[in-house]
């Protein structure tokens, strides 16, 4: 096992074509730090996509641990949900952060983002299951709610954050019912 890990790491270092897609994953993960959240909006906190992804993945792990006694997931399903959360916003590395209202106003952008996500999930050999999407979506909404509240608590007077907070709270509660 350790020999395999070392061999893969060595191939990554040498830019071996066998592991080309994995080099892209590492590069895209690095690029997540440069994608600002809340695109082009005045923010008092500098949230970036990598921080958001880390919080979403941590929340997914918490949700999976809390529900361990209730859910009947096998280990492969848990791993799929966890991996899905790690890569759920990769399209934003390519397309940048697009707020929901923009996607609603321009459905073609939403379609492009969904197609990009589907393609990325195929490359990563991830099952795009409804369960993984649902659990990740709840964590994603929760983190957006956290970010909106953090902006308000920091003194941001932009009414969009209050609107976002209320919208995310409503969406979060709807998803739970």
Each language-model region and where it sits:
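Post-HExxH zinc-binding segment in Zn-dependent metallohydrolases
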Residues: 109-128
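Divalent metal-dependent phosphate-bond-processing catalytic cores, especially two-metal-ion Mg2+/Mn2+ enzymes
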Residues: 4-11, 16, 87, 128-177
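Active-site flanking loop/helix segments enriched in acidic
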Residues: 26-52
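Active-site-flanking alpha-helical
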Residues: 91, 95-96, 147
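Alpha-helical scaffolds flanking conserved acidic
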Residues: 23-28, 72-90, 131-138
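Post-HEXXH active-site segment of zinc metalloproteases
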Residues: 98-113
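Alpha-helical phosphate/pyrophosphate-handling elements in metalloenzyme active cores
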Residues: 42-81
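Membrane-helix exit/interface motif
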Residues: 68, 94-99, 121
């Amino acid at each position: 096992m350790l020999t395999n890990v070392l061999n893969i790491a060595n191939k990554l270092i040498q830019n071996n074509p066998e592991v080309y897609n994995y080099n892209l994953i590492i590069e895209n993960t690095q690029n997540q730090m440069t994608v600002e959240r809340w695109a082009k909006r005045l923010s008092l906190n500098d949230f970036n996509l990598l921080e958001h992804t880390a919080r979403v993945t941590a929340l997914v792990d918490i949700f999976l641990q809390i529900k361990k006694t209730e859910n009947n997931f096998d280990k492969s399903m848990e791993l799929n949900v966890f991996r899905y959360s790690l890569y759920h916003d990769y399209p934003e590395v390519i397309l940048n952060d697009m707020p929901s209202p923009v996607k609603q106003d321009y459905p073609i952008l939403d379609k492009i983002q969904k197609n990009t996500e589907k393609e990325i999930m195929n490359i990563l050999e991830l099952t795009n299951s409804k369960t993984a999407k649902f659990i990740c979506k709840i964590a994603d909404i929760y983190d957006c709610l956290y970010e909106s509240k953090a902006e308000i608590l920091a003194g941001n007077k932009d009414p969009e954050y209050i609107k976002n907070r209320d919208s995310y709270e409503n969406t979060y509660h709807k998803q739970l019912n």
